[in-house]
Amino acid sequence: MSSTIMVILSAFVAYLLLMIVIGVVYMKKTSSSEDYFLGGRGLNAWVAALSAQASDMSGWLLMGLPGAIYSLGTGQIWIAVGLFIGTVLNWVCISHRLRKYTIAANNSLTIPAFLENRFQDKKRILLLLSSIVIVIFFLVYTASALAAGGKLFNTVFGIDYHIALAIGAAVILCYTFMGGFMAVCVTDFVQGTLMLIGLLIVPLVAYLTLSGSLSDLLTQSGAPGGAAAFLNPFENGERPYTFVEIFSQLAWGLGYCGMPHILTRFMAVKSEKELKKSSMIAIVWDILSLTAACFIGIIGRAYLLPTVLGENGASSSESVFIEMINKLFSSHLGLPFIGGIFLCGILAAIMSTADSQLLVTASAASEDLYHQFIKKDADSKEILAVARFTVIVVSVLAFVIAWNPNSSIMGLVSNAWAGLGAAFGPTVVMSLFWRRTNLAGAVAGIVSGGLTVIVWDYIPLAAGQTLGSYTGLYSLAVGFAVSLAMIIIFSLATKAPSKEITDVFDKVAGK
């Protein structure tokens, strides 16, 4: 192993040890299930904002999005635009109402529990349904994060993908298992800061060291359709983007209001005042990080010449940020330790999402399934033990799903994001803002949204294509629309909610 690799490795080891230390510290402060799942509702503005955004973006931000732009051009920025709009609406419209409502609805600790309490579901249908949806789709989502970690270690250190996968999974498992929500949020705060610094500095320094004009270098790299088409957000290689393609990318923003690992941050902020600060911090972080990630894909195409990723045995395009850091800090600047720190930023993106997803899945399994259906008299410490056991089980299952080294990070994230967004997004929005929404509507929304995504993405037509591949329309857009329609239809076709339910709604709405 070369001295450069050893220096980079030392940065990784130091970073991973810091994450584990944070887990140990918060393990001593975690004594109940409310501490483990929501940190006692004690998050401050900075931790809430950066942990929410870091857990949201994942390795997709530093690998998936830059890789898509590297391969296909700036037409892929519409995903970033959709996500930014979704982030703003989520923080401005959803966060305050959700925090107030979860407290009013029997101090709900999880999204499934909130939905059950919101509609006073005595038969517990919502709790069971939503917990199952979370476990299924978060398994896929967690697998995408582990796959990104495996590719990172494989590319940087030449470690076998499967060994790299095991290392990443083990570290994430350690601090999530020990410290719960506060450990996850504090590590995500550190990781969100590191991600943003890396995203801003690397493309800027790489651009300043280019050996020619960006346009000429893009042409030399064989950019699809030439430099002009590559830099045109309305072009897809040698042809214009269709309305369906742009709409499908913008539709990613619909997913935010259905993401339990993001929504729980809103529930955990300690005051309305802190939540307002969090909103501004999160929105600024989001626009800076998404813009920088797009520039990584563009500048990376020119900077890495003569290498063209994805061709002649080179790394895949999703490794563009990794390759830029290696070339910039190890070859050009001779600062491998600094490069190692920025590579830790990619690891941070991966870990910040995986830990949050593990925690939400653990809460669904222990609080919503075990406590409510299997052992109703379980005390807080027993629920905590079940949650920690769930973290282990889910980590192992996600590890198995991510076993294939050819797994697409973008593909795995896309499927999980669509499933969660379509199942929960319309239901959460309507439960917060439409007084007439009832239990039947909520159940219909979750079932129809989740099933639509599964049918759209996985059930082949006669020709072997799925509806998604045939139409080019993102399943989240279809699932969200179907779910919303079913909520309205079933709510209006069945009995109106009781006065007891609407009184709580009116109280939260300030009527």
Specify the residue positions occupied by each region the protein language model found:
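Membrane-embedded helix-loop-helix hairpins and adjacent transmembrane boundary segments
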Residues: 1-511
